[in-house]
């Protein structure tokens, strides 16, 4: 195996580096006009420094996105839909608890689906309670992973810490 660097023949800017079979060195620069290739030794390559804070933040975002994907298995995604769910739950709990208050969301849905507001309220409360349990499981996994990433001291530990077994959250 040979180590090589491909560079712009006009500017000297390094374009890429790598390893190849002994007979393939000349082929490494044939991809574009103006590229040149040079065989180098391992000592010539320095590993680029990695910004661990940027890696950590990228992993946080990846964890959050994955958690949102899992949530979407149980509820309709979207912040406006989430607000409607909360409003319907508030109305449903008021109906179940015998409170007298307007129920525009439940009334509209009951009329559209042909069920009573009372039956719909019971169903909404049951679904909200089931969702709360799932949401708590998802949130615990999400926060645990982010806490592990925060404590990790190198990129390998960060990568391992960010792994979440979302399959724990049953359907």
Where are the language model's segments positioned?
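A preference for well-ordered globular domain cores
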Residues: 2-27, 41-171
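A short, surface-exposed interaction/processing loop segment used at functional sites
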Residues: 26-36
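A short, compositionally biased
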Residues: 1-3, 32-33
């Amino acid at each position: 195996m040979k180590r090589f660097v491909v560079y712009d023949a006009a500017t000297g800017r390094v374009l890429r580096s790598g390893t190849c079979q002994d007979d393939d060195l000349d082929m490494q620069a044939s991809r574009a006009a103006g590229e040149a290739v040079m065989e180098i030794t391992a000592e010539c390559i320095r590993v680029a420094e990695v910004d661990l804070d940027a890696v950590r933040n990228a992993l946080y975002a990846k964890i959050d996105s994955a958690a949102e994907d899992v949530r979407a298995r149980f509820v309709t995604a979207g912040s406006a839909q989430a607000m409607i769910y909360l409003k319907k739950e508030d109305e449903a709990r008021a109906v179940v608890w015998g409170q007298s208050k307007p129920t525009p969301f439940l009334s509209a849905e009951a009329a559209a689906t042909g069920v009573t507001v009372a039956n719909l309220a019971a169903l909404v409360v049951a679904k909200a309670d089931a969702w709360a349990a799932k949401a708590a499981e998802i949130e615990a996994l999400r926060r645990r992973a982010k806490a592990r990433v925060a404590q990790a001291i190198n990129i390998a530990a960060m990568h391992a810490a960010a792994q979440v077994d979302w399959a724990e959250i049953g359907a």
